Amino acid sequence: KNETIILINRKLSLIKMSKVVLVMSHLSCADDSKSKLNKKQLLKFKKIKSHFPESLHSLSNSAGILLGKNYHFDMVRPGISLYGGHCKKNEKKIYHQVVSLKAKLIQVRNINKGDTIGYGATYKAKMNMKIGTLGFGYADGFNRLFSNNFQIKLKDKKIDIVGRVSMDLVTIDLTKIKISNSIMKQEFEIIGNKYSINVISKMINTIPYEILTNLGKRYERRYIS
C-alpha cells in the first residue's frame, strides 16, 4: 500500500540504524498471470526495496516464480510446486508427480445381487459381487464427493469405489480382481500417477493445496529421496 511507503519514508532514519536482513512480500493474484495486480504489486515492492539496498528481497511463491525473472529478486519461496501441485490457472504439467497416497485392505467379503453398500444405500449391487474395504475415509481427508465417483489403482487395474465414503472406511469393487492370499498385503493407490493432486482437485472443484493439507494425521508418512 502507498501508506506503507509513506510510513517507511518517515521512519527511514530509524530503519537505517537497524539491520534489516530480509524484505519480503506476497503476491495476491500470482495464480492468474493476466491479473493487473501482479505488476502493480511488483512496482510497489521495488519502491520499498530501494530503501533496503543491503537486504535480501523476496516476493514470489510457486505461482510468482512462473511470472518471470522480474519477480524473483534474491530468493523465491516455492511451496505447492515442491509437491508437484499446480499453482496457476490452466497450468500445463511441468512438475513431476511427488505425492502418493496408498492404503491396504482390512476386509474382503461377498455380497449378493440386490444388496446395498454403505450409508444411505447409495449403491445397489446389480450382480453377486466381491467387495473390499480400505482403512481410510473422510476423517483422513478423502472427500465424500468421491463416493461412487472415483477409481483406485491396484498395479495396472482400475477399481471403482462403490458406496458412500464413510468416516474411516472406503469400499471398492473387487469382483473382477483375482483374489490371492497376498491381496491383504498389497497397496492400493489413491493419489499417484493416475490421479495426481491436480487431477483430484479439479474433480471436486477445489485446489491442490486443499487436497494436500487435508491429508490426515493417521496416515503413515514415508519420505523418499
What function would you assign to each model-found segment?
Residues 1-104, 108-112:
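Active-site loop/helix belt of alpha/beta enzymes
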